[in-house]
């Protein structure tokens, strides 16, 4: 039986761009990832899918890259030939993943092993968990409702495309929904439908398999885990963001120039994002906190550095839908180029409450790492002492309790 994942390209581009840096610059790094479901409740306990998940993981770990897939990766100018040679030999190892349950019906997943392996599991496992969960809830009415919502989005994008002023910076969206999609076939249907409705607006997808299949641009640079790893590498904690950005610049020499800002919060990020980085990077990505406040801070920072912000890109990717994205574009279009990565609202808007699931890096080389998100609910670590130390080092206040 073919598994839910049938190609190792069926993941987000940034897994490849981050793994290339890991292979070239710190290949010996060991890491631990842990699964969380942030939903207060689910229709049925996630523990119920444990056995099916184990079967899917076994199938996933049989996959290898095909020559056609490797040729596609080789065609991306920022992917280096030695990395493709490595991927030709690559196979995920099942022994690095443990799946368990607890007496509250929760699903526990731990990935522990070399980062060059562990990092690559994340998107696959999240997509598998989603598809297994929603498979039991699927009815013709669910698909019908999903289609109704999708057609409404397509109609809205047509309206926006017609209203765009060609003399203004364009409104561009991308699919960022692989990790929480309903299923692959639905994700492809969504992208095809929106591309047909508004080809001038749909810029691409983070999913490499679908980018290749549909002939559109694969989108992505870095995730939080890349920057977090530097909290445990051979640099002073205070300098981890600078070290991570320097490492990225060394690898990509001007390509993939969008920096993620919320590992220890926007204010702490901007203290490290000096003139050197501000000139080198094409722009910034927002993934937590108030996007308007965040963008205004970015604008003030570029103004202070005497950089024309209209040459820079703000990418937004936190809980977006088309209306929120369009409103943000209207607010920032005269000051920045903008881009919007829309995830769950595109690929899993079927009428059911989506799963809010994550698989996050919590340790690197045996040392805790953490994210001090601009949204308190997104902060994740298994070490409260380290979290407090990180707050102290970067002068990040404790979030106010409601």
Curated annotation (Swiss-Prot):
One GO BP annotation of this record: NAD biosynthetic process via the salvage pathway
* GO MF annotation, one: nicotinate phosphoribosyltransferase activity
Which InterPro entries does the record associate with it? N/Namide_PRibTrfase, NAPRTase_N, Nic_PRibTrfase, Nic_PRibTrfase-Fam, Nicotinate_pribotase-like_C
According to its UniProt record, in which pathway does this protein act?
Answer: Cofactor biosynthesis; NAD(+) biosynthesis; nicotinate D-ribonucleotide from nicotinate: step 1/1
Q: Name one GO cellular component term.
A: cytosol
Question: What keywords appear on the UniProt entry?
Answer: Ligase, Phosphoprotein, Pyridine nucleotide biosynthesis
One Pfam family matching this protein: NAPRTase_N
The chemistry this enzyme catalyses reads: nicotinate + 5-phospho-alpha-D-ribose 1-diphosphate + ATP + H2O = nicotinate beta-D-ribonucleotide + ADP + phosphate + diphosphate
State its Enzyme Commission number(s).
Answer: 6.3.4.21
- Carrying Phosphohistidine, the residues are 224
Post-translational modification note: Transiently phosphorylated on a His residue during the reaction cycle. Phosphorylation strongly increases the affinity for substrates and increases the rate of nicotinate D-ribonucleotide production. Dephosphorylation regenerates the low-affinity form of the enzyme, leading to product release.
- Note whether Phosphoprotein occurs among the keywords: yes
Q: What class does this enzyme belong to in the EC scheme?
A: ligase
User: What SUPFAM superfamilies is this protein classified in?
Assistant: Nicotinate/Quinolinate PRTase C-terminal domain-like (SSF51690), Nicotinate/Quinolinate PRTase N-terminal domain-like (SSF54675)
Q: What does this protein do?
A: Catalyzes the synthesis of beta-nicotinate D-ribonucleotide from nicotinate and 5-phospho-D-ribose 1-phosphate at the expense of ATP.
NCBIfam families registered for this protein in UniProt: NAPRTase (TIGR01514), PRK05321.1 (NF003704)
For this chain, the family text in UniProt reads:
Belongs to the NAPRTase family.
The name of this protein is: Nicotinate phosphoribosyltransferase
Organism field: Neisseria meningitidis serogroup A / serotype 4A (strain DSM 15465 / Z2491)
